[in-house]
Amino acid sequence: MKIRMRKKWMALPLAAMMIAGCSHSETSNSASGSKDTIKIMAPLLSPESPSDKSPSLKALEKYTGKEIKVTWVPDSSYNDKFNIVMASGEMPHAIVIKDKSAGFIKSVKAGAFWELSPYLKDYKNLSQADEKILKNSSVNGEVYGIYRTRDLIRACMIIRTDWLKNVGLDMPETLDDFYEVLKAFKEKDPDGNGKDDTYGMVVPKWMGLGNGSPWDVLQIWFGAPNRYGVENGKLIPDFTTKEYMDALTFFKKLYDEGLINKDFAVMDSAKWNDPVVKGKAGVIVDTGSRASQIQSAMEEADESNKDIIDIVGSLEGPNGKRTFPTSGYSGMITIPKSSVKTEKELKEVLSFLDKMNDKEAQILTNNGVKGRNYELKDGVFTSLEKNNKSLLYEHEGLAQFSMSIPKSEYYIEDQKTKLFQHRKDIITEGEKIAVFNPAESLVSDVYTQKGAQLDNIILDARTQFIIGEIDEKGFDDAVELWKKSGGNELMKDLNKLYQSSK
């Protein structure tokens, strides 16, 4: 698909509303400011935002040649504040967008942001944006933001290798192997305490569909599509396929046999690691970064727990090896037309964003200042922030407007570990066998209005089927309810967009 260029723009209606409740590093009411100042709105996930005097921020300003003024908004209320900002007319030069929310799509349709695809080719880093990820982050083929890179391949199975050794099994390679491992972790006393107090895999409560849940990953291994399949040239929902039902039947088997936690539908995801760390479960299906978290926690509990955790990228199923990819991005950085009024100003902001992707800028935003936040000896990175959170907060928030295009070049502390190397191998292998969502870039008005309601119908039916409240006919009835509640309308709209995108 070619990323299309938008040539005509609509004016965004402005309301006289004031921005409230945001912590920021400047007090000027002028959104345009001087040409030497770049104003940014970004979410704050840390307890503290970087101050105006942050050494990392000052070094970043020196490197980019711009004074950087950031309006920090608490992450929990970010989308609400975005809507207020868009109505106020008092906009910064760049706004971090977390997702394709209804408010963002409405603003795009009102012509609020620059369409960037004609300009990216003129910049050293931005010109190297991945075409597939650029498509995924687009709105029906039009690019309204510079995506923030995240690994395209993250999904994996995390497993306790000490338990594997104790039950006499090798690392699983197929779905059949996977089942046998979970069964052994339940029945063969993998922790050796003589008690029936372990199970195979822990799964938390998970909202949404096609967003990387353990169920999503396993469905791909079973051969189901990623959110939507293509049949006779048309999109179809994944949950209408035989492969999806095969996966769902497998999930129910795991539940019935006690191989997963009985409270999966309500378990707090913040406690997801605990059963593995505490020796109650032996498997999690999530991401490589979670594997590193668990390994670190286990070593903190007992220094002898070296290399206990390992990972497998994908398991061979009926259709061979397949893996669940991410969209390749986590939000994007947009440029409003009301504050960046001319092409000359646009190119100046793009030059700044391009420079933010240089290795030097990536290190400042993600690692901080050498000698203060970290040290580098013989090429080995060591953080100096472990016992000093205030040092971390000097730069942690700055990573919210780091894009890492064409690739991440900042330092990662565990890069010398066996787990990190396995993660790299999984990414390389996964890119060859990834099953992508063919509708990732498509934004349907029907889904914007009814998507949450429609998704909940399937989410509820999936849980009810797994725990035995409904059978296959009951699930089919839920699919019919989905269709009558707007699903048929959604598929008609998506297929129209899909045909136009080819």
Curated annotation (Swiss-Prot):
It is a lipid-anchor. Keywords: Cell membrane, Lipoprotein, Membrane, Palmitate, Signal. The keyword Magnesium does not apply. A lipid is attached at residue 22 (S-diacylglycerol cysteine). Disulfide bonds: none annotated. One of its GO terms (cellular component) is plasma membrane. Its main location: membrane. Pfam families: SBP_bac_1. This is Lipoprotein LipO. It comes from Bacillus subtilis (strain 168). The gene is lipO.
